[in-house]
Amino acid sequence: MFSVPFDNLVLYFCRKLILFLYSKAIYDGKRNLLIKRGEIIMSREYLKKLIMAALFAALACVATMIIKVPTPGTEGYINLGDAIVILCGVILGPVWGFLAAGIGSCLADLIGGYFVYVPITFVIKGLVALCAGLVYRAIGKTKTTRYAGVILGGVIDIILVAGGYFVCEYFIYGAGAAASIPGNIIQGIGGLVISAILYPALIAIPYIRNSSYGFEN
């Protein structure tokens, strides 16, 4: 039977995701390209957002799959993807962040064979990014409050991931789902710390800063 190395399979799916969104962006950009200068700029911004969303979706997928620690009592696992999920909402905004975080995270479950978690992960991780983006928009007016927005996004991640997965797993595994709560809390804390470290480094990159939610002109 034909087999593909696991790492190559992950890269293959991530590359396909980026190419799909990029080609869609080009198509939509050409379709929406109008004579007025303002509308042309909007099409370019739309293209830029799609490319950024594709990149962050791929990052979320890879980060989720780098390290997996199985959680007792369920078929789930602890991973490092939460940091990217938080940053999806902060950097891309609520809507694009929801899509990038949800798609990238559930793609990791799909590739890893955690099929029962695919829809659950899409909703929960998408909601984390959505809420993180909304909080960031509400308070991220200065450098200090932007950083506070990232921290609050991490707190949201801890609550939604630990609570959301417990509720969903309870209907699947029963009382054994409670065993995953400590692991999900640890995962959320790790996501908070890592996202707080990565945020200033990412924003320092001109392309990401100029494309980021909250830094738009």
Regions found by a protein language model. Give the residues of each.
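Loop-helix junctions at membrane interfaces
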Residues: P5-N217
